[in-house]
Amino acid sequence: LNKSLLRFITCGSVDDGKSTLLGRLLFETKAVFSDQFSQLQADSKKFGTQGDSIDYALLLDGLSAEQEQGITIDVAYRFFSTEKRKFIVADTPGHEQYTRNMATGASTADAAVILMDARKGILAQTKRHSYICHLFGIKHIIVAVNKMDLVTYEKLRFQAIVEDYKLFAASIGMVDPSFIPISGIHGDNIVSVSENMKWHKGPSLLKLLEDINLEDRTTLSQPFRMPVQLVNRPNSDFRGVSGTSISGYISKNDEVSVFPSGKKTKVKEIISPNGS
């Protein structure tokens, strides 16, 4: 069976539970081998933040500084698969100073899971990451309200956050995000539907990811858009920008706009690995 591949990212503010969610997802989809699980148990005792319980975030936080500080710094890529689809997920950092690492993860993603802490709701970094996802043309946005166990799985709290986010999404032009209440640490609504939130009638997070339609991926008919990942300056006579085109096409002498400044310029030359 030739299964489709979905690239997605997890993003949101610091401590909203991104790494824990993904660690749980990897564990539940049998993407963790027995030796990895043994190491996870040992690391949980040494570095964990969950007492005697397994700290699933440690499956993603690979740098020693990340484990010791309990944070994500670099973008961690992981692969897993189900009977229906293959996935490559980028776990991106929530701290403001690592935002450019998050943007790198967003530049190749088909979908984004934007996490929020049910106790805190929308924060500045939630908005920043949401705007970056929208700017990079990510069409499939899933807003996951995490840590629902800490608000006693309260339906009204979830609904209030949904309404707040809908207003924000409309203000930046984001269309039709999906919403799901979850608990990454307890596995509620991650792989299977939660018994603790029977009031929520939607599918699990994994089912939402499996059902994303990739047929509407960006085509050449749409305007040219390229997230800049590197400014090339090998010498004082040359300055170029590198990145992956995510829509449209570009030709020499075409006028382009640079965001967020909105300044306009023209394409002087297009250079590929084979030359101009």
Per-range role (PLM):
Residues 1-100, 109, 144:
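P-loop NTPase switch module centered on the Walker A-proximal segment
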Residues 7-11, 150-153, 157, 167:
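C-terminal effector modules of nucleic-acid-centric enzymes and ribosome-associated factors
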Residues 15, 21, 40, 70, ...:
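Residue-level signature of catalytic and energy-coupling elements of molecular machines
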Residues 18, 34-35, 123-124, 150-155, ...:
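Switch/connector loops and helix/strand junctions flanking conserved nucleotide-binding motifs
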Residues 21-25, 39, 101, 125-132, ...:
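Alpha-helical scaffold elements adjacent to nucleotide-binding pockets in ATP/GTP-utilizing enzyme cores
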Residues 85-87, 92-98, 106-130, 134-159:
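Conserved Switch II/interswitch segment of TRAFAC-class P-loop GTPases
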Residues 159, 166-276:
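Conserved catalytic-core segments of large NTP-driven translation/proteostasis enzymes
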